[in-house]
Structure formats: C-alpha cells, structure tokens
Amino acid sequence: MQETGIRNGAFGADKFGLKNLKQVHWNLGAPQLYQYSLAAGEAVLSANGALCADTGEFTGRSPKDKFTVRDASTEKMWWAGNQSITAEQFEALYQDFLKHAEGKTLFAQDLYGGADPTFRIKTRVFTELAWHSLFIRTLLIRPEKIELDTFVPELTIIDMPSFRADPKRHGVRSQNVVAIDFARKIVLIGGSYYAGEMKKSVFTTLNYYLPERGVMPMHCSANVGPKGDTAIFFGLSGTGKTTLSADPNRTLIGDDEHGWGPSGVFNFEGGCYAKCIKLSQEAEPQIFAASNRFGAVLENVVLDEDSRVPDFDDGSKTENTRSAYPLDYIPNASRTGRAPHPKNVVMLAADAFGVLPPIAKLSPAQAMYHFLSGYTAKVAGTERGLGNEPQPEFSTCFGSPFLPLDPSVYGNMLRQLIAEHNVDCWLVNTGWTGGKYGTGSRMPIKVTRALLTAALDGSLRNVEFRTDKYFGFAVPTALPGVPSEILDPVNTWADKAEFDKTARALVGMFQKNFAKFEAQVDADVRAAAPDVKLAAE
C-alpha cells in the first residue's frame, strides 16, 4: 500500500481495519485535491477557480436512510426520532465497507470537530473521492501540521458513495446508508455523493456527547459585535442562518453548528456550507465572493457550457445548490471560532403561511416553547422526497434530524442558559408576507436586516410593542427605516378574513404539534403557547 502526505505512522489506516488498499493520500491540501479530482473526472473547474461537482441522484440529505446502533450504551437515545440497527447488523455493514475499500485509492483527513480545545472531537475521515476530502477539510477545523504526526482519532468516518448497502443483510431501508455506532465512534456513509452527509454526521456525534459535559450543541449560526455582544441564529436549512450571520459590521463565528459551554460560544466547524440558489453579488457580496475563488467547492451548481461561469439562478439540478468555503474567505470572520456568552438569541422561521410578523420579542418561556416547536417551512431540495413547494414543518430544536437525545435535554439547557446570562430572545420570519406561499412574496432581506440590526444594537428595546392576539408575543409597532404596515402582517394581506382564518389554522397546528411536549415542560412554558381558545373558535 502506497501512502503519501503527513500522518501518524503509528496509527494508520490499518488501525481502522482497512487493508489491501491501493493508495492512501493523507491530509492533502486544496491544490493536490483539485489535481486528483480533475484528473479522475470527479469535478470540473469553474471560471473563477471553484471546484464544481455534481452529486447525481442525491442532492440533499436522506434522513430516512440514517441509522444508529441500539445497544446498552444508547438507551438514552431519543428513539422516537431515530432509527435503529443492531450491533450485529452494523458489524456486517462495517466488514462489507472494509471489503469494498480493498484495491481502492482513499483520501484521509485528520481534523477537529469543535474550536474549543476542551470539547473538540478528533475526527479522521476516509473518502474515496478527492472532492469529498476537500469538502470535509474545508468544513471541519484543520490541525497545525505538527499535530498531525501524533494525531489519534476519537471519531472515524468512512465515506464511499460507490458502496451499496443490502437492506436485508444490514437492516437498513435502501442501498443508501448513514450508520452510526456511538460506542465505537464509527460512522459509515455509502450510496450518496452528497457531501453534506459527512458534516452532519460529525454534528450528530457532538449532539450526543456534549450535553453530558455541560455544552449545549446548537444548529445555529453566530456572530459577535464590536462590543463583544454575541448573537446566535437558530434555523433550518434555507431560513437565512448563513445569509443573516454574514454581516459586514459584525464578526462571523460560524454559519451552522455551535456549542454553548461554560466559557461562551464556539464553532464546531472551520468552513461554511451556504445555499447558493439565486446567489448574487448585490444581495450577498461576502458569500458570492467566497464562492467564486480557488478552494471553494460548488455542489450541483450549473456552469455555462462555454465560459464555465456559475449560473447561480439555475435550479435545474436542484434548488439545494451549495457552496462550501473556508471560514477565512469571509473577510470579517473570527480567527478563533469562539465568542463570549450570547446577548441575543434569534429563532428564524420561513413561515409559508405568511402570518408571522417579521420580528417578535419572546419571553424566556416563549423562547423555550418556540425552540421545542421549531416551526419553519421545509424548503425544496434540502432533503429527498420534498416537492417544489415549501411545506410547513415543526422540527424540534430547529434540528430534529440531528438530535440523538430527547429534545427536552436541549430545551432545558437553552432555558437555563438564557436565564443565567439574561439573554434577549427574538422570533424572525424570513418566509412570506402579503399572503401564503404562492400568493405573497418572500420577506425583503433589507427589512429583515434592518430589524435584526435594531434588535442586536439594543435600539429595538426602546420602541413601542403590541401583543400579538394570535401568538401572544410582543411585536414592534414602528421602527425608523422600516415600513410600518409590514410589521403587522394583517396589513399586508388584501383579504383580511383569509388572514384571520390562516392565522387561526397555524395556531391550531402549533397546539397539535406541542401536545407531545406538554408533559415535559412546566406551567410557564405551557402558558406561552398560542391561545387554544382562539384556535378552536
């Protein structure tokens, strides 16, 4: 077996059971990985230097194909939200992965999940594709060269899109599989070329281990102002986490995954993974610039046949086009990935019904209610099985597919942290205004940015608020620079009776969804629910 690159010779591929490999390329950088990827025909070069790859059948995550080993160590798992396989089935899958790898050239990266040295997880990722190796090297945190000589992984991932699972033998649903064994700290990914499965496997692992160490893992972006005022933005894919946290007046901590621990907030990653459908220089200059340079990886972005210039408006392959780039491609990104305890928590919802206000102030009890509810609209393309229209979705903790533990674990941690650090909480609608999806229009990003700026700099505390009669939270009535009519969504609808009917229906959906949490929360949180009587009228 031929090996190249810097590595720990005493802890190589054989320690994972990989044998009879053709080659292993260790910890290669972008230039070498570009070379291997282009030579193998895995990807093409865009006009501006980004590497552009097509993921084929799978253009998003496939949560129905994700499985966790059920054994004595995982009885604390939230099995209502996770699928299980036996240790024996996983072992058969593992052995078949090892057999499939024989004779292949693999790329290995030694990386960290987590910017806080106390809580990070040492992660080794084996991939059969060079561009997947570049992707995960970009998304996680790279050790210093000197650390690679003695690197011993805690978590190992093997990612082979050419592998096909056997549902009968392996206890899975299809030929596509993501399988996690928390006891052995092994993740197996097969059948899918969608690179996002790798990063979310690391996130799921951190979601499992960190709470017992006093760290709340969060599906959120984060930034910090010049006065050290950290803000975190919860939200599902497509709700604006990446876009809204990339603010030229604030330092970006990260765009997707963070921990909130004893010393503040820290990024789990060293890169960004931005949705780039309809990406433009005018609306998102930082992300546009980062996506159009050497070292960026574009997924399913259509290139002009002659010029090779990316056409970010073209969603013919998928609406879930993506750009992965190093965090330091954003000019004002943090170099440490760490920040003080938050002053503001923002929950982003892409409301497909168009009845939530553009911003609302939440009490601590309302914050826990909306965190456990995790309301948004699933946006087309981020998962398999969705159509072209957004669907209303309650994804608890704004990240249900990535939660190995009961949602109440994360909800209680958030409530304690909000109380301990006197945090202001906000609900922001980045979805529709002036009607439902199909009738109304998307909330103008300039309005959202203006409202967020006012919330984060403290000026929103000084305006007049009204109590929303449907949801009970506080909504500003006026703010300089923002049209007053947009602050009260009913004013943006031509048909007021239809608005009332739609708002009542959404209240009912919240109530129905939250029923499963009522026994786990106290009276304050139950009282923070939208008005039950109103929904039943």
Swiss-Prot record:
* Positions bound to Mn(2+): 200, 219, 256
Cofactor binding remark? Binds 1 Mn(2+) ion per subunit.
| Record-linked Gene3D superfamilies | 3.90.228.20, Phosphoenolpyruvate Carboxykinase, domain 1, Phosphoenolpyruvate Carboxykinase, domain 2
- Which PROSITE patterns does the record match to this protein? PEPCK_ATP (PS00532)
Q: Where in the cell is it found?
A: Cytoplasm
Q: Which cofactor does it need?
A: Mn(2+)
Q: Which reaction does it catalyse?
A: oxaloacetate + ATP = phosphoenolpyruvate + ADP + CO2
Identify the InterPro entries for this entry: PEP_carboxykinase_ATP, PEP_carboxykinase_C, PEP_carboxykinase_N, PEPCK_ATP_CS
Positions of substrate binding:
61, 194, 200, 322
One GO biological-process annotation of the entry reads: gluconeogenesis
A GO cellular component term found in this entry reads: cytosol
Summarize where ATP binds, as residue positions.
200, 219, 235-243, 284, 322, 448
Tell me the route in metabolism or biology where this protein functions.
Carbohydrate biosynthesis; gluconeogenesis
> Which branch of life, at top level?
Bacteria
Which EC number(s) does the record attach to this protein? 4.1.1.49
Which Pfam families has this protein been placed in?
PEPCK_ATP (PF01293)
* Keyword terms of this UniProt record: ATP-binding, Cytoplasm, Decarboxylase, Gluconeogenesis, Lyase, Manganese, Metal-binding, Nucleotide-binding
Q: Name one GO molecular function term.
A: phosphoenolpyruvate carboxykinase (ATP) activity
Q: What does this protein do?
A: Involved in the gluconeogenesis. Catalyzes the conversion of oxaloacetate (OAA) to phosphoenolpyruvate (PEP) through direct phosphoryl transfer between the nucleoside triphosphate and OAA.
Q: Which family does it belong to?
A: Belongs to the phosphoenolpyruvate carboxykinase (ATP) family.
Q: State the name under which the record lists this protein.
A: Phosphoenolpyruvate carboxykinase (ATP)
What is the phylogenetic placement of the source species in the record?
Answer: Bacteria, Pseudomonadati, Pseudomonadota, Alphaproteobacteria, Hyphomicrobiales
